[in-house]
Amino acid sequence: MKALVRVAVTGAAGQIGYSLLFRIAAGEMFGKDRPVILQMLELPDEKAQAALKGVMMELEDCAFPLLAGMVVTDNPDIAFKDADAALLVGSRPRGPGMERKDLLMENAKIFTAQGAALNKVARRDVKVLVVGNPANTNAYIAMKSAPDLNPKHFTAMLRLDHNRALSQLSTKLGKPVANIEKLIVWGNHSPTMYPDYRFATADGTPIIEAINDQAWNANSFIPTVSKRGAAIIEARGLSSAASAANAAIDHMRDWLLGSNGKWITMGVPSDGSYGIPEGMIFGFPVTTTNGEYSIVKDLPIDTFSKTYIDKTLAELEEERASIAHLLR
């Protein structure tokens, strides 16, 4: 057995948390040879804490061989203590009549506090994935609130968008998703994201040779991927939970265990690539090895793509400006 890993999960009794915890305990995130301690955080109210205790009871009843221990708490300093990985799933959802700027402010308070707690008690090499929306800006806030931690280790989840785009291409081409490579989702995890298959291949053949159809790209593919979350809410009455948890597993597994040379999409702090301001958390194509990621460099950006990338960048800049006063 490899060394024990401590993984903190916020919003642990929520729908995504419930879909995620059992898969982590089964070894799907860190490997089948890595024991885990789950450190679960929920809101400090009686109902949330009771639900969290129920989740813990179910985890006990699964008798997972790799589950070496559990912590349930409403205190971030306890949840993040010595954490090797932190999945920040919990966030304030948008309520009726709530403006986007109000949502940003409410979440800024949460992620400022969680970033500070990580800075105080987590391992110095902790790897952080923000799932709670608005994920990119929440990750940026947490990163800025943890000045003693490696900023490269604060990431936002765009893997759900990446997986959604893979599925749409698979259906269009009649090819298995496993045979499709070099897909990218640029930018913000929001409807402004830009799924880009210009470099993608299926069975090694460029996809643009099979789908040379800019109308389908602009009028079907991009809108379907970018509005998929809303379509699921309309159909199910609830937001994506199992698919979001699955994407979080994919993101962390590939980051920690390596992507074997394959391109994946991660929201990571920009190093200035593609004209994205340094430090902005932005969806890029990356490869991963030995627990670190590298942005795929020097891809040509055509006029069509630049229009979409500029739009998602403008949204992120607006979000960042709206919370800047909280980070001074």
Swiss-Prot record:
It catalyses: (S)-malate + NAD(+) = oxaloacetate + NADH + H(+). The active site is at H189 (proton acceptor). It comes from the Bacteria. Keywords: NAD, Oxidoreductase, Tricarboxylic acid cycle. Signal peptide: none annotated. SUPFAM superfamilies: LDH C-terminal domain-like, NAD(P)-binding Rossmann-fold domains. It is an enzyme of class 1 (oxidoreductase). Its EC number is 1.1.1.37. One of its GO terms (molecular function) is L-malate dehydrogenase (NAD+) activity. The keyword Phosphoprotein does not apply. The keyword NAD applies. Pfam families: Ldh_1_C, Ldh_1_N. One of its GO terms (biological process) is tricarboxylic acid cycle. NAD(+) binds at G11, A12, A13, G14, Q15, I16, G17, N107, Q114, V131, G132, N133. Substrate binds at R94, R100, N133, R164. Belongs to the LDH/MDH superfamily. MDH type 2 family. HAMAP family: Malate_dehydrog_2. Catalyzes the reversible oxidation of malate to oxaloacetate. This is Malate dehydrogenase. It comes from Xylella fastidiosa (strain M23). The gene is mdh.
